[in-house]
Structure formats: C-alpha cells, structure tokens
Amino acid sequence: MDFSTPVLKHVEKHIQHRIHFMNTTVYQSSRYKGGAYTTSHLIFNPKIGKFEILVNASVSFGNELNKTFEELGFNSLPSADDLEKDTKDVNETGRKYLLEAYAGLKVKRAGVYAGILDTTSFFDTNEYANDEQNQFLNTDLVNNPLAVLPSYNPGLILNLNLSHNFSLQFGWAQGDPDTESVYLMQFGFSSEDYHVYFYYTHSPFEEVKSLGISSDYTFENLGFFFRFGKNNLEDYKYFVSGGSVLNLGKEEIGFGYAFRKGNKLKDVNVLEIYFKHVLSSYLHITFDYQLIDDVRNTYVLGFRLNFEY
C-alpha cells in the first residue's frame, strides 16, 4: 500500500478533480439554542509526475452552537467544522481563508510535504471517524482531543513506506495558537481491510507530550474504528473512542462513543448517531443526534447538507 500520500480530508474518494469545490450547511439544535452555519472549501490539487501542490481555501458563515458551548465551558463541541471565527483569523495569525498551501514530492518509497498543512491529514487518520463533513460531527469523534495535532500551520512531513504494510512518518509543525513547535512521529501497519497507527507528539516549549492509537477495520459493508489517547497534562487521564459504520449503498448509518476520563476536569461522555442518505454522486443529506455529558448534559439534533464537485 502507498503510505506516502496524505489523506485528502472531506473529499469523497469517487470525486477526484484538480479543482474541487464543496459546501456543507449544518443546522443544529440543543436545549440551549439552535442555529445554522455554512462552510465552503475550494481545493486546488494538481499533480505533475511525482510532484504535487495542494491549496485549500475556505469561507464560512456562522459559529452557532460551538460558540454557545464554548461560553458554557464545554470541552467537547458539537461540530469539528472550520467555522467563521476559524477561517477569518486562522489560528489567530491574521491570515484569512487560506487553510492549506503546501507542496509534495514522492520519490520511490518516500513522500516529503512542506508548507502550510494540516497534521491530521497525516497523523491520527481513520477510515470511519476523521471527516466532519461526511462522517461524525462531534470533535471527540473526528480526532484524538488529547493529542497535540496542529492544523493549518507551517510544517514539514516525511512519509516513509517501509514495506507493503508498514509505514513510518516524521513531522514538525508550528503549534499556533496554543504552543510553539510540535514534533510528531507515527508508525503504521495497514492492509486492504484494516489500519493501525501508533503516534507520539511532543511540544518542547510547554513540555506537552501525547501519544495515541487510531485503528479501523472493514468487514464487507461494516466498518469499525477505535482510538486511544493520553498526554502528560492533568486535565484528563486518558481518552478512548470507538464505534461502527454500516454502509447500505445509498444509505450509511454511523454509531460512535467517546469518553475522556477526568482528573482535574469532569469525565466527558459523547454519543453520536448519524444517518446519511446519498441523493446523487455530488449531494447527500445527514440526520445527526448527539448526547454530550460534559460540564453539563445536553442533546444536539443536527441536519447536514453536503455538496461536492
């Protein structure tokens, strides 16, 4: 298998264009309030031989439930999307709308990527719980919340295919706005049916160290995923998540559960169920239900309309 290519998040596998457009509109309602947001991405990804570039620009309108949940002190948020506050001032750097812009070169069994990039396209990837526009919406069911995995910052990634099944990855990225430099390492084992990744991150400036496991398994039309995370901070002892996704052709049903074991902070439980219906090759709708037990306990009902071309 080829491990030297990053995961192109949000993009459905059957849609591969040099210029790719997607729009996601989401309405969510909870016991606190309801509201909608819309986010659009324009991705330019030309490939010439072994060389490629990727540019990902995004415009969003609305922050909706995430803003309310943050004000209430929630640590688990109902949407992992890049919202208006995220795209108008990316990582508090003053940069607007440009999320990714990097170049990549593949040579034999290696791939090198440099520029403004998202480390979650390389580390902690997962077949069934890694894409808030097509899969689960909640932040705890998209990536490991205890790992230091910077997004949309300058970085450098080296991917190595050790063999047909084994991979090794090294990375460096700026950690704005939370920390300075972050160093990453990941070892992976994969086949056509399953993937297992073990990774470690270290931010020397604040001495934040984290480790994690991300794995998935496919059996016919049924998929399973599992994550584990831990860091050296005192807020949580560990994080674990898991679930399954049933593919019925034009329909998809996902069930996921995530748990943070509290230490200084309260335990966090997240349950999410979604039902996705494909209307066409470029359009699908999703009905989503979340239970979030954090600083408070609430439900979140959601509807997502996604268009890609």
From Swiss-Prot:
InterPro entries: OprB_sf
Gene3D superfamilies given in the database record: Carbohydrate-selective porin OprB
Domain of life of the organism encoding this protein: Bacteria
Family membership noted in the UniProt record: Belongs to the OprB family.
Protein name per Swiss-Prot or TrEMBL: Uncharacterized protein aq_1256
Organism: Aquifex aeolicus (strain VF5)
